[in-house]
């Protein structure tokens, strides 16, 4: 006899999700930064990336987003929160004039901890993001990926994203990590 899998879905994040988002974000961010550096994070950087500090930011984002175009989503399996994503209008200064890049949605975060990976949660989050981008009449989606984050690079490349040709560096005290901007053009509504 086989056991049915619990329901998996994506929904808008709610305030009671905040502690989970803070924990998840701290864990995934520390791991990604350490991998990009090739060594442990400097103590002062690690001390800033606490679950509590990140949860405060997510609480503000959920309870008082700057506009309706800012969204935070939660992936749920059964009753457990297993991932999250956040989107906002892209910073036009990074991608050029608005008339050259109308309606670009930036994926600020799309995180599924390794222990919940490979179950479709990331794909469900990305599909929900694409639906919101379509509602907002966006023509592109973009995301910043740290050089060396092969899993995230493969995920977004497999979803049709490609390098935009823009990068930025983050100084972490004992080293610098580089992020590359990846993007995809959305199919026009029929």
PLM regions with names:
Residues 143-153, 171-173:
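Conserved beta-strand-loop-alpha-helix junction that forms the acyl-donor binding cleft
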Residues 24, 136, 158-159:
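Structural motif
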Residues 3, 12-15, 26-36, 44-115, ...:
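Acetyl-CoA-dependent GNAT
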């Amino acid at each position: 006899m086989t056991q049915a899998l619990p329901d998996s879905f994506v929904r808008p994040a709610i305030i009671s999700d905040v502690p989970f988002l803070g924990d998840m974000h701290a864990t995934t961010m520390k791991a990604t930064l350490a991998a990009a550096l090739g060594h442990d994070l400097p103590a002062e950087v690690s001390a800033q990336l606490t679950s509590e500090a990140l949860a405060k930011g997510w609480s503000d984002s959920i309870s008082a987003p700057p506009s309706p175009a800012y969204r935070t989503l939660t992936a749920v399996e059964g009753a457990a929160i297993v991932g999250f994503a956040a989107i906002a209008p892209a910073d036009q200064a990074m991608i050029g004039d608005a008339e050259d890049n109308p309606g670009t949605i930036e994926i600020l975060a799309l995180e599924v901890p390794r222990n919940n990976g490979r179950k479709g949660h990331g794909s469900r989050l990305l599909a929900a993001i694409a639906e919101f981008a379509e509602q907002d009449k966006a023509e592109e989606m973009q995301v910043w990926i740290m050089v060396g984050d092969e899993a995230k690079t493969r995920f977004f490349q497999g979803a049709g994203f490609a390098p935009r040709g823009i990068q930025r560096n983050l100084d972490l005290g004992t080293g610098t990590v580089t992020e590359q901007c990846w993007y995809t053009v959305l199919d026009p509504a029929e």
